[in-house]
Structure formats: C-alpha cells, structure tokens
Amino acid sequence: MLKLFSAFRKDKIWDFDGGIHPPEMKSQSNGTPLRQVPLAPRFVIPLKQHIGAEGELCVSVGDRVLRGQALTRGRGRMLPVHAPTSGTVIAIAPHSTAHPSALAELSVIIDADGEDRWIEREGWSDYRAHSREALIERIHQYGVAGLGGAGFPTGVKLQGGGDKITTLIINAAECEPYITADDRLMQDCAAQIVEGIRILAHILQPREVLIGIEDNKPQAISMLRAVLADAHDISLRVIPTKYPSGGAKQLTQILTGKQVPHGGRSSDIGVLMQNVGTAYAVKRAVIDGEPITERVVTLTGEAVSRPGNVWARLGTPVRHLLNDAGFCPSADQMVIMGGPLMGFTLPWLDVPVVKITNCLLAPSVTEMGAPQEEKSCIRCSACADACPADLLPQQLYWFSKGQQHDKATAHHIADCIECGACAWVCPSNIPLVQYFRQEKAEINAIRLEEKRAAEAKARFEARQARLEREKAARLARHKSAAVQPAAKDQDAIAAALARVKEKQAQATQPVVIQAGSLPDNSAVIAAREARKAQARAKQAAHPVADSAISGGDPRKAAVEAAIARAKARKQEQQAGSEPAEPVDPRKAAVEAAIARAKVRKQEQQAGSEPAEPVDPRKAAVEAAIARAKARKHEQQAGSEPAEPADPRKAAVEAAIARAKARKQEQQAGSEPAEPVDPRKAAVEAAIARAKARKQEQQAGSEPAEPADPRKAAVAAAIARVQAKKAAQQQVVNED
C-alpha cells in the first residue's frame, strides 16, 4: 500500500485556474521530418537576439568569416552571436529585425560564399571532467539562450540558480496552436535532448528532473520514453492539453503544485525551467563544440504549400524560408512570427530569423477570419475566468486606458504573461493584450526615470556632504592656525630676536652725548667731495658723448618754444592782464626756422660733430604744426581771433625761410667755423647782462610795451643752448 501511495505521489500532477482550449492546428506541420533549407545568398545577424545588452563587435567590414565564428564578445548578460555560414562581412549597419514595429537594430550583414565551412570545433565529450564554472562559461560563449520564446541567456540563468535549485523542469508542453518545432525536435533528436538535460542536471545538481509534455504529442512521448527506459534520474510527466500550460509559472504549478509568488520567479521556490530546444543547444555547444547558428522553425498556414519544420540558419530572411515552403501570398496576406495568440504580424518579409523565432505562420483569409471592430466592455468577466495568472483583466483594461499606473501596478499587471487567453474569449473583441503591453512599457519607463532621478539625487547629496566636510575641515585648519602661529613664523621671530641680541652684544662702547658740542661731519663731507671728484672725472673722460647727449635737437627746441609761447599767453589771460597781441603764425614759423639755423651754426662753430642737416620740407611741416598748435591755444584761451593768414603769403614766407636755412647750411659746410673763445663768450655774456639791466631800468622809468611771450620763449631757448655749448667748450679747453 505504501508503495502504491508513493507511486501515486510521484506521478501526481496539479491544475491551474483559467486556461482555454483553442483549435490546435498542429497536424499541418508535425507529420514531416526536419529538413534543411538551402543557404540564402545574404544573412542579416542582429547583435541583440536575447534579453540584455548587445555584445561588442569583434569583426569589421571586409573580414572573411567561417561558420561558428564569433561576431561579438559576450560579457555579463551580453550574449555573443556567431556567423551562420562562411562568407564576407559586407556591412555593419542598422537593419529591421523581428519586432512588432520592425525596429532597426545594429546588424552584421554577410554575403555567403556557398562553402559553409566550419571553424575548428573542439568538443568536450567527457564534460564531467570539467568544472561547473567552465561548463557555464562555455554555454555562454557559444551563444545559447532560451529558445522557448523569452531569449534569456542560459549561462546567466544557470549561474543565478546556484545551489538553491531543487527541481529542474524541462518544458516540452508547446501549448500554442500551429507550433510544432519542439514536437518535431523531440521526435527526431530525443537522444541528444536527453544528453543536454543530463549536462544541465550535472551543473545544477537538483534533487529531481522533470519533463512536462502535453498529451497531444504521442510520437514525441514514445520517443522520449524509449530513450529514458533505463534512466532513473529523469522523470517524464504527461499533462493534459490546455492553453497556456507551457507558461513557466503554470507548468511549475502543474508539476510541483507550488505557486510562484506575485512579482517573483520560479527560482524563488527552488525551481529552474529550460526548454527542450535549449537542452539540445546545450548538448551541441558542450559535446560537439558548435555554437548556436541554427534552430528549428515551423513553417505553417494555408498560404504555404509545403508546411513543416526546417533547420533555419540564424539571420536567414523570412522571405527566403517562406519561398522554400511554397508561399502563395494573397492580396492582403499577413505573416505572423510566433503563434496566433502570442505572436505578432511582420510589417514586411525582409526581417531575419533570430534565436527566439519558433514559427512563421502564413494563414489564408478564411483561416484567420475577417477583422472585427472593437466594442465597449460589457463586464461579462469571461476574461477573468480565462486568465491563468488569476488577474482581473477588465480592471487592468480600465486602468490602462485611464493611465492609472499605480492602480495597475497594485493589481499585479507585471504578472501578466501576455498569453492572449483574455482577448480570445472577449465577446467585445477588445485587444486586451495590446493595452497591457503598452501599460507595462509605460510603467517600466516611469520606473527607469525614477531610478535615474534617485541616482541623481544620491549623487547631489553625496556632493553636498563632501562639500560640507571640506568646509568643516577648512574652518578647523583656520582655527588652529589662528590659535598657534606656524612653525616657520616662530623660526622667523626667533631669528629676529637673535639678531637684536647679537647687535646689543657687539655695541661694547656706549654712545656719549655732550651738551653744546657740535657733531663731527668730516667723514660725510669727505665722502661728498669724493663723489663730486668722481663725477668730474667721468664727465671729462666722455666729453664728446656728453656733448652728443646734452645737445638738443633744434627742431624740437623750436617746437618747445612755440608751446612755451602758447602756455605763456594762456597764463597772461588767466591772470587778468590785457590780451597780448595776436600771434601771427607766419612770423612764428620764420622765427622758429631762424632759431634752428642759428643753433645749427653755433654747433658747427663749437667743433662738435655736425648734426644731421635739416630738411627744409620737414622744417616747413613743423612750422605748419607749430602754427596749428598756436592757433588752437588762442581759441582755447578765448582771445580775439588773429587775422586769418593768407595761404599764398604763408607759402612765400615758408619758401624764403627754407632758402635762408639752406644758404646758412651751405656756408657752414664750405668754410669751417672758428673755435669759440671762452673769453669772448664771457665778454658777450657780460654785455648781454648789461643790456638787459639797462632795459629793466628803462622799463621802470616809463611803461614798456607789453613783452611778447613768443619772442621771450625763443630768446630763452637760444640762450639756454648757447650757455650749454659754451660750458661744454670751456670744459674741453681746460682739458
């Protein structure tokens, strides 16, 4: 009795709520063996054919590749993809892929060479000799992913299971109508599938291994039983046909009686599930050393003349496979990738086959029926009765339409497996699955944005905390510096005190101050006399240089004289004196030219180096500038405007001045000037002083005519130059 009870418990199966029984339509394609499809001339391999990020490219345009050669590198959840055949990489560019919107994803495009040459394959026939980590890494690097539809990387899934997995379930239910890829694979490759299951069991070391298969696959069941006849480590469980019994949570409940909690995974209750196609791919990767480059695809529907299951290379265009099956499209022909309940319609047929492509359905118009108009929900609760996840689809529908994301999340919309059972039974023809997919996408986008905002806030708070710490440390340093002087400051203070003490010690004789005594300045006087003697000696050593330096430019002297005259006139006006006689710019120019000629002649007579001859044209220009400056000073001082100069007379006078200057230069160059006698110069200076004194006396007796500041400035300039030259000549004569 105990044995019978144990046997009953061993083969016991459970049921799940909900579910539907749609027409199976599997007999169209499961009756013919697997066959190969001729190679397509061009393959398009998307870099992302799984859940996770795409891998890093390791080929470039123009490279020749072999079948099984890695096109990308896989790190973490980045699963590598491999070349489906030998050929040449002609492009790496975005291409439309297997997606309801045919989104463009980065793909490697290969032109096949028709040789279909493999890379060097190295199989591990004795896989038990390798470690668990090595087997998982090999499975990952050979590109094995879940072939049941999810596309989750198998290596990552095995690594995450760890030691907490007690039950390994092999999903062979294949519950969706029309699809027979797993059924045909189990009929033709049952031994290889069982070998792959044993590799997975060796990695996970579970207590039990269960194979769940629906009872509508008698040939596959018989083949598996034949292979497992002598096996005691693997149990085959035949379950009733019911859609969607192939769901991960539903099959787990059927075989173990355990329910996966809301928001959880099968691994949370010690269960890990793999598809039969995945087990076959694991066997080829580990034992045969072949990366996943092909998979079984069901070609079915009334629009194809030769339905069946084929080995389709990854990257093969859908059009190529359908044409091989005798595709006869109608006017409004649709092609569905996947089954009629969970699949999606392809916008065009140039998309490639990927790892999750298990079926290509090309139905006729009568087979699918005419599209029906969506009506309002009548709250019949048929969708709730059919839901295998125990959800309330009608409530989720209202929340999705009303953008009530919080309520949709509270009603566990994330647990929806998008099986389509609710839409199948809906009498109002509401596409509930489409609403749920859109709502889940919006919720995921909101959560992603909230996560980014939280990360940004955390970074900001960390920065603020760091700034506060730095500020506190800076204030602490300032306080410590204010309380106690720095070491170098103390050293400087100590050095200064030492110097003061040393000076005090050196002062042995005290300073005595006597009242009424005069200071002894003899040393200071002697130093001053020495500096004077040194200056005289230096001046005598360089008489010519001093002469050259001290000698002023007569042209500059004339300009300075004109400016001096203007300043003197302005000062007279400010002092309130009578306005001087208006300045005649023509006379000023003539006087400036004569003054320059006299100065030049005196320089030549003194024996100094001849100055550069004055250009008459430059003299005329300078005279014009002097006239303009004088006129401007007159206007600023507010004096009466002078009589406007006649330009013709000014030109004549300038020409006469230039002729006189040129004549004086020629005379100075033809005969050398006599050296100036200092005694004569002294006599002339005395006579000049006497004349000046006499003029002053006359000015005191009777009022003189107001002096012309211009003439006074010119005379002063000439006197300064003459005195300077006489002094230089006297020094030369004394030497």
Curated annotation (Swiss-Prot):
Keywords, in A-Z order: 4Fe-4S, Cell inner membrane, Cell membrane, Electron transport, Iron, Iron-sulfur, Membrane, Metal-binding, Repeat, Translocase, Transport
Lipid bilayer topology: Peripheral membrane protein
Domain 4Fe-4S ferredoxin-type as annotated: residue spans: 368-397, 407-436
Protein name as catalogued: Ion-translocating oxidoreductase complex subunit C
Subunit record text: The complex is composed of six subunits: RsxA, RsxB, RsxC, RsxD, RsxE and RsxG.
Record has Transport as a keyword: yes
HAMAP family for this protein: RsxC_RnfC (MF_00461)
Gene Ontology BP terms: electron transport chain
Family: Belongs to the 4Fe4S bacterial-type ferredoxin family. RnfC subfamily.
Secretion signal, residue range per the UniProt entry: none
Subcellular location: Cell inner membrane
Gene: rsxC
GO molecular function: 4 iron, 4 sulfur cluster binding; electron transfer activity; metal ion binding
EC number, UniProt record: 7.-.-.-
Enzyme class, spelled out: translocase
Organism: Salmonella newport (strain SL254)
